[in-house]
Structure formats: C-alpha cells, structure tokens
Regions:
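Intrinsic-disorder/low-complexity regions
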Residues: 16, 31-32, 59, 78-80, ...
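Proline/serine/threonine-rich low-complexity linkers at boundaries of modular beta-sandwich domains
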Residues: 18-27, 522-527
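Histidine-/acidic-rich catalytic cores in large beta-rich domains
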Residues: 124-528
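Generic marker of residues within folded, mature protein domains
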Residues: 12, 20, 35-37, 51, ...
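Acidic, low-complexity Ser/Thr/Gly/Pro-rich repeat segments typical of extracellular/periplasmic
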Residues: 22-132
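Short, solvent-exposed coil/turn linker segments
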Residues: 2, 38, 52, 294, ...
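Short glycine/proline-enriched turn or capping motifs at secondary-structure junctions
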Residues: 6, 114-115, 507-508
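Bacterial Sec-dependent N-terminal signal peptides
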Residues: 1-24
C-alpha cells in the first residue's frame, strides 16, 4: 500500500511536536524543597492538557524516605482529567527527607509525552498534631467549658412569636427599618453569656424567627446558603484529650446534616471560617497548621509553636487536587503578629474567594493583606495590602496609610470584578471598622476605593465581621466582635449609605458573619 505525502507530513509533525515541544506539569505538590510537610500528604501533578489514564501506573512513581524507605501507593486521575494523584500506602516518618521521581512517559490523550519529575521535601518533626484548644479558646474569648459541638434538631418552618422560642434564644431588637431587601437574614450567634445559647438562625426583617437550630457546646460559624441550595456552617470540635479540629457541615433545607467537609492530607484542623462550593463540584477550604519553629532569629522563643495555613481544593470525591501552604511562599517577617510569644498566630487567614478568572483570593488578617493565588500553578499573582503591598491606592483616606485596610475579614468578588471586604481597621488611628469596595487594575497595580461605609458613630470590631453586596445594590455589614459590647450586630444600607435595617442582640453576643439570601419554601440560587 502506498502512503500519501499527507500521512508522512502528519507523522513527522507529531514526532517533532513531541520531541521539540515537550509538555510539562504546570503544578506539583508538595513544592520542591518544601519544609514541615504533613506525614500523610499525597503527591499532585497537574498538566494543562487531558491525561491518558490508560498509561498511568504506580510504577511511574519512585517515592523514597530517608527513614521510611520505599513507598508503594495508588494512582488516580481526578475528575478534571488533568490532575494526577499519588497516594502513598503508608505515612512518611517525622523529620525525614522525601525524594520523589516520576518517570518520563506519562502521556496526554493526544500522545504528547510528559517529562520526568524529581522533587524533594522534608516532613514535619511532629508525630502527632499540636493541640490547638488553648489557642482557640483565646481567639474566641471563650469563658464557658469546652464540649463536643453538636447541633440539635430543633427547628421550625414558620415565623415564631418570641414567647415560643427557647428561653436561651437571644433577643433580637430591630432599631431601624427603612425598606430593606426581601431576602432572609442568615447568621449564627457566638455567645459569651452562659444564659444564652448558640444558634443557627434564619430571620425576617422584623427580627422574627423563620428557622433556628441550636448548636451545643461551641458555635457555628458562617451560616449561609450554598450555590446548590443547601446550607452550611463551620463547626469547631474539641475531642479528648483536648485536641481541636474543625469541619463544615452541609445541610438540606430542613437543616438536616447531609455531608461533612474537612481538609485532607493529614491537616486535621480545618479552620471553620471559609468554605466555597464551586460550580464544578469541587470545594475550597483551608486548615491551620501549627508547627514547632525556632523563632530566636526574630527575637522569639527557640521552641515556639507557629501556625501556618494550608489551602486545599477538593474534587467531587474529596481528593486533595490543589494544595497551597503559607510556609512555601510567605516570609515570617511579613506578619504583624507578635513574634516573641510562645504561640505565634502568624497568618490568621479568615476568608477565601474565587476571582472571575478562577484564581483564589486569600484574606490574611495578621498580614493585613489579600493575595491572589494562581490556581493552575500555585504562584502568587499579586499582593494587596501589608508589608509587601504591590498596589497604589486611589481615593483612600491618607490618614490610614500605609495600611489603608488592616486585620480585614470576608473578601468577596462582585459581578463587575470589584472586591469588597470588611476592614476591621485595627491599625487605623484611632481604630475603626468599615465596609469597603475596591476597583483593582491588576496590570497597573492600582486599587481605587469606589465605596465605603462607616457607621455613625464609628464602630470598631476587633475581630470577625462581613460585607455582602445584594442584587438590589444594598449592602449587608456584620459587625463581628463589636456587637458583643452593645453595638449593632447587623446593618443593611442602601446604595446611598442610608440605613435600611439594623438590629442588635444582648451584650455578650457576636456573629462571625451576617448575611442575606433568598428563602421561600426552599432556597433559590446564591452566590458563594
């Protein structure tokens, strides 16, 4: 049979394309030469093109620990068909160096050959996680006894009169009502008063209760509606002998738990502050990672416990398919935390958001900064605020320079591409809190303040807080820690900043976030 010239052309082109234009992995985890890596980490390789799953084999992975020796494992291809996951059969050992060599020969579905990979990393010296209960007790200013947190099934499907509520339900006092939006209010109180319980609650604009669910022991954080119509909240759990960990509880519209999300790879303390359910069925969340660090070069304790943060993306099967650790990217000296204490809360992250291009925005309270993380490579695209700020500010209050916002919470991306955040304002003189909206020019690195709301008189929330823009242009502000001392817990403002709705709870009550979502017989769509 005579072969055509066209056949030979495509054959030669295919060979040249494979040899001269080899493919590469866009993302690899753990990062090469990284330190303090979890003993239970998986290995992640991501290509920009779909992988030929039939060519994947555990034999392509040569994983060796200097103490634990050779590690066999299993290989999976994630649901994006681009991300290869290797799960060692046994954990690594503390304080060992791990060498990973991936053979050349893995192919994309169109036959392109991916290169070999060689990375090294060092594991954590810890054989067991550090107990975080004392750190969290201080963070949330808890005076009550720590118990296992457990949501009870008491909820109601209609508006309730005050005298039909439990005796420990917090009183809601509406102080202003001026044509607020129609959505229902979603929040959970954090009580510092023994006579008042912790509740997930859905409220009408007049303060009456649509649904509630009591949380026994600690509290629920960030009660909200997910894009799929389910609801979620963050849950702190304290297990004997005092080790703390967190999780996110997903519920149906009857407030019945249907799923649980936690960080993987051995990062046990899922920080229950931010959980995103993405359109592709994946989820984003992050963990606190306490590690022993010699802080004497910074004037601190040579045996300090320092907390880093670990962002994870989980696929629909809850495999970790993306992992980003502050240890790998952020210098210790970027933090405004006291570096001389025995326990250093270095980062104190509190919120995740996804930008219009799919990349991650990460709010770090103790750095007074927001960073944008490239979700395909893990690289930092930019830093807004803090010691490494890359932006020039326009229309801002120059008396707040250089940290125009500080110790912030609750980063969100608006449909027009602008971002909102709750500026706690800890570094303002004097301190005051506000909601802000910035228009970012990522190319020219400018941040233009296009909206802000300061309460009159000023309110200072030393911790927590939220800002949410509604579809009708109104904005919701949750005042976080400030409401525990008699300030408003919730304020809704019109586009002209006149107050549409405001209410308080008794002293000793605060809310991590206060939000609004549509609610009728069920839940309509919601933004993350």
């Amino acid at each position: 049979m005579k072969l055509s010239a066209t056949f030979y052309f495509f054959l030669i082109f295919s060979i040249i394309n494979t040899v001269i234009f080899p493919q590469k992995f866009d993302y690899i985890s753990p990062k090469d030469n990284s330190q303090l890596v979890s003993l239970s980490t998986n290995i992640i390789l991501r290509s920009s093109e779909d992988i030929d799953e039939s060519r994947l084999s555990p034999k392509d992975f040569n994983v060796i620990g200097t103490l634990s020796g050779f590690h066999s494992g299993i290989v999976k291809l994630s649901d994006d068909n681009k991300t290869i996951l290797f799960f060692p059969d046994t954990p690594f050992l503390p304080n060992e160096n791990i060498s990973i060599n991936v053979n050349k020969g893995i192919k994309t579905i169109d036959g392109k050959v991916l290169p070999s990979v060689a990375i090294h990393f060092n594991t954590t010296p810890l054989s067991h996680p550090i107990d975080l209960s004392s750190l969290l007790q201080s963070e949330y200013q808890l005076g009550n006894t720590i118990e296992n947190s457990e949501a009870t099934n008491n909820f109601l499907n209609k508006s309730l009169a005050a005298d039909s509520l439990p005796s420990d339900f917090p009183q809601i006092t509406v102080t202003t009502s001026n044509n607020p939006s129609d959505e229902k209010i979603f929040l959970s109180n954090i009580t510092q008063t023994p006579s008042i319980g912790n509740y997930l609650m859905i409220l009408n604009n007049d303060g009456s209760v649509v649904k509630y669910k009591k949380v026994i022991g600690l509290f629920g954080l960030g009660f909200k509606v997910l894009p799929n119509g389910q609801l979620s909240y963050g849950d702190d759990i304290f297990a004997s002998p005092g080790f703390a960990y967190g999780r996110f509880i997903v519920m149906d519209t009857t407030l019945t738990p249907v799923d649980v999300f936690q960080t993987g790879n051995g990062y046990n303390y899922t920080f229950p502050a931010s959980f995103l359910l993405l359109p592709n069925g994946h989820s984003l969340l992050f963990a606190i990672d306490p590690q022993p660090v010699d802080m004497s070069p910074y004037g601190g304790n040579p045996d300090a416990t320092v907390t880093g943060e670990v962002i994870q993306e989980l696929d629909a099967s809850k495999n970790v398919v993306f992992q980003w650790r502050t240890w790998d990217y952020l210098p210790i000296t970027d933090s405004y935390a006291d570096l001389t204490t025995n326990t250093v809360d270095l980062i104190h992250a509190n919120a995740l958001a996804v930008d219009a291009d799919g990349d991650i925005l990460f709010s770090m309270r103790h750095l007074s900064s927001i960073i944008k993380i490239n979700r395909q490579t893990g690289n930092i695209d930019w830093i807004l605020g803090g010691k490494q700020n890359q932006f020039s500010y326009i229309n801002e209050n120059e008396s707040n320079a250089p940290n125009y916002f500080s110790f912030q919470h609750d980063i969100r991306v608006l449909p027009n591409g602008n971002i909102t955040l709750f500026d706690n304002g800890t570094q303002h003189t004097p301190p005051y809190s506000r909601g802000v909206e910035y228009k970012l020019n990522e190319q020219n690195k400018t941040a233009t303040l296009v909206w802000e709301y300061r309460h009159s008189p000023d309110i200072f929330a030393s911790a927590n807080g939220s800002v949410q823009r509604l579809e009708n242009g109104n904005t919701i502000l949750g005042w976080g820690q400030a409401s525990a001392t008699g300030n408003p817990m919730f304020t809704e403002v019109h586009p002209d900043n006149t107050v549409a709705l405001e209410f308080t709870m008794p002293a000793g009550q605060k809310s991590f976030r206060a939000l609004k979502f549509p609610w009728a017989s069920g839940i309509s769509s919601a933004t993350v």
